């Protein structure tokens, strides 16, 4: 068996992570019906998936993925600027732009790649105006911070969802050189709370700032026709980034905005230029999801209603769920050991709700990140509420 020269360091780092109760391990899952997961020989009700609308197992997505793969092949064969720009890519982009109400859209390989590569390209375009002023929410996803760090720009961080603080920071630097960017999310993945997008857009307009909005966890679930919260802002936002891997049940990501913006990214975004294009099967699933999602208002309403009911139950049990107002409901228990124990209690009762610990969330805020799905019915929600109450009692008694 081969060993690397650094295995001793890797092993030591893993041991330290285990001592802090933050070591992670992969668990093998197999296919199960929507809203469920087969894990270690058991079928569990799945409250950890980002498949918010239950589309990952929808027959139309599977059928169109298979059809497009059969007709067009298993792969795109190259990056889009070489010879991988299929008519299918442009078809999906045009459909997405129509639904988003933007001039154009551009497909990318993943949400992480989009944020990590698009942000540096934007900052490069503005370099002639001086060092860009980049205002970021303190709880932004790691990929947004990574994109800023990759560009070598200084982040001016505002308190989470605190638009008064953001406006104060912008006013402090009024007249300073450099293009202004506000980078934030519409729905925050670990807390399930929302940004006030119309107010953000108005604030950005007042301060002549470019608004970059990550809609990964809103796409499919929130906003007009399920197309995200950018649609609530008159005139939209400068750039909306979103994914197809969560509410839309497939894979990949997009940016939507002006034609000039998307054409510029084709020429300047490394993550677009140097990556093999999305394959036909993935494009087929995306295309099918885009046909379905605008018609799922009833499913979205039921999903958000489940969130309201769960939050009320957690509050009655004395479990903090922060400012959640979406399908993502954190059960914040603080201690990493308590979060692991509560997750184990739920799994013993047939439910999967994974514990989230530092560094994914700040120290002292370990939690179960409960992700609801339209595939869950009232019976599954009842089961979750009962298991949380019993499990939390058991954890506190054992502490």
UniProtKB/Swiss-Prot annotation:
The modification N6-(pyridoxal phosphate)lysine is found at residue 246. Signal peptide: none annotated. Pathway: Cofactor biosynthesis; biotin biosynthesis. GO terms for biological process: biotin biosynthetic process. SUPFAM superfamilies: PLP-dependent transferases. Substrate binds at residues 24, 141, 360. Its cofactor is pyridoxal 5'-phosphate. One of its GO terms (molecular function) is pyridoxal phosphate binding. Pyridoxal 5'-phosphate binds at residues 111-112, 189, 214-217, 243-246. Belongs to the class-II pyridoxal-phosphate-dependent aminotransferase family. BioF subfamily. Catalyzes the decarboxylative condensation of pimeloyl-[acyl-carrier protein] and L-alanine to produce 8-amino-7-oxononanoate (AON), [acyl-carrier protein], and carbon dioxide. This is Putative 8-amino-7-oxononanoate synthase. It comes from Bordetella bronchiseptica (strain ATCC BAA-588 / NCTC 13252 / RB50) (Alcaligenes bronchisepticus).
